[in-house]
Amino acid sequence: MAWQVSVPELEDRLQCPVCLEVFKEPLMLQCGHSYCKGCLLSLSRHLDSELRCPVCRQEVDSSSSPPNVSLARVIEALQLPGDPEPQVCTHHRNPLSLFCEKDQELICGLCGLLGSHQHHRVTPVSTVYSRMKEELAALISDLKQEQKKVEEQVAKLVNNRTRIVNESDVFSWVIRREFQELHHLVDEEKARCLEGVEGHTRGLVASLDMQLEQARGAQERLAQATCMLEQFGNESHYEFIRYHSTASSAELQQARLLEGAFSPISFKPGLHQADIKLTVWKRLFRKVLPAPESLKLDPTTAHPLLELSKGNTVVQCGLLAQRRASQPERFDYSTCVLASRGFSCGRHYWEVVVGSKSDWRLGVIKGTASRKGKLNKSPEHGVWLIGLKEGRVYEAFSCPRVPLPVAGHPHRIGVYLHYEQGELTFFDADRPDDLRLLYTFQADFQGKLYPILDTCWHERGSNSLPMVLPLPSGPGHLTPSQPTKL
């Protein structure tokens, strides 16, 4: 015969109606219902009237309730060996088979029927256990997810920390290297200044030594002449008169020739003490600038009047327009031309020889700026220029324009672009070791910037001199490394 009930369902049917646990020492009442021996005795003790079966409410005699041996054997067969003994209620000595949802504590069946938990919602321990196991599993799952997130965060923090330390080490190495090179340059300038002072001093001292030697020789000769004259002072009248007439005038004339022979010399090393730091800083500033760029002009951007030569490094405004294709890149109104290479990051320095031109402009322009029609010379239109007008007015094309107090007429202009810092600086570069600041634009550069030269109108030949992009030359320059990114 096949079983129609599973073991879990069978266990549910073998529960005591009082404690809702599997029967312990089951006793059978006259009505046929069975109860745990402990539950039945507890009911009998706590009832003043006749005992009624909690299931069918029939009056029964608990004293004549025999053990339900068959039920006990079934329960014994279902029980696993080694199952722990259930905990018991301290009040009724019955197994803790129920859980009070209100008070959140374990109780026995009598506590739920007769005790302080009589009207509370109670749940079998097995059900509560299953529910709590599910809640615990869900909590563990949530905790594992949170743990995974925290582990990922820890890994990111560790990687971030490692990256910061590595970048710091690299940047510290760069700083040490740069300062070593700066110290080397400072030592070179120090040696140069000292050598200049010492060389100047050697020349002055040599001149003074020569004068001193001449003066001491004259001093000795005068002493000898004086001694000789004093000796003749003791001669007879005739001898004295004879010598005086021939020698004294000659000795006196020689003494007069020595008067004014000494010329005082002042120590002028060409470097004032108060200007040492400024002078050295100017020299160092030139050396720490990036190495000059080797630029060429782009013929496809040149205005038709412009003539390019010497490998596209020289441009001048001609009298006749050149036959050139009309291209979007070409200027058709302003006499401008761009360099063939632009810059969208980093630090760059280049120079432009303007010579004795009476009118010129130079600077940088955004690659997207319009090249058709009159050039809008202002930062708002992506153009940053300085220039000379009518051979006497230097100006920066900002808004509004700014006149520049330029001393003299620079023939060579230096341009320094620091893209990330948004700085475009112009210098008088006639003296390589003494760059003189002309003007600095501050801007938030976007996109590629191109060096631009504007020769201006030739003025019927009076402004036809060329502008030149010179090849880099001269002493080596310290080229600082690009800064590292955190």
Swiss-Prot record:
Protein name: E3 ubiquitin-protein ligase TRIM50
Enzyme Commission code(s) on record: 2.3.2.27
Xref: InterPro entries: B30.2/SPRY (IPR001870), B30.2/SPRY_sf (IPR043136), Butyrophylin_SPRY (IPR003879), ConA-like_dom_sf (IPR013320), PRY (IPR006574), SPRY_dom (IPR003877), TRIM/RBCC (IPR050143), Znf-RING_euk (IPR027370)
One Pfam family it belongs to: PRY
Residue positions, PTM N6-acetyllysine: K372
One of the GO BP terms on file: innate immune response
The keyword Chloroplast appears for this protein: no
Gene expressing this chain: TRIM50
Description of how the protein assembles with itself and partners: Can form dimers and trimers. Interacts with several E2 ubiquitin-conjugating enzymes, including UBE2L6, UBE2E1, UBE2E3. No interaction with UBE2H. Interacts with BECN1. Interacts with SQSTM1. Interacts with NLRP3.
GO cellular component: cytoplasm
CDD domains per the UniProt record, alphabetical: Bbox2_TRIM50-like (cd19787), RING-HC_TRIM50_like_C-IV (cd16605), SPRY_PRY_TRIM50 (cd13743)
PTM annotation: Auto-ubiquitinated.
Uppermost EC category: transferase
GO molecular function: ubiquitin protein ligase activity; zinc ion binding
Keyword set, alphabetical order: Acetylation, Coiled coil, Cytoplasm, Metal-binding, Transferase, Ubl conjugation, Ubl conjugation pathway, Zinc, Zinc-finger
Lineage: Eukaryota, Metazoa, Chordata, Craniata, Vertebrata
Reactions catalysed according to its record: S-ubiquitinyl-[E2 ubiquitin-conjugating enzyme]-L-cysteine + [acceptor protein]-L-lysine = [E2 ubiquitin-conjugating enzyme]-L-cysteine + N(6)-ubiquitinyl-[acceptor protein]-L-lysine
Function: E3 ubiquitin-protein ligase that ubiquitinates Beclin-1/BECN1 in a 'Lys-63'-dependent manner enhancing its binding to ULK1. In turn, promotes starvation-induced autophagy activation. Also interacts with p62/SQSTM1 protein and thereby induces the formation and the autophagy clearance of aggresome-associated polyubiquitinated proteins through HDAC6 interaction. Also promotes NLRP3 inflammasome activation by directly inducing NLRP3 oligomerization independent of its E3 ligase function.
Compartment(s) where it occurs, according to its Swiss-Prot or TrEMBL record: Cytoplasm
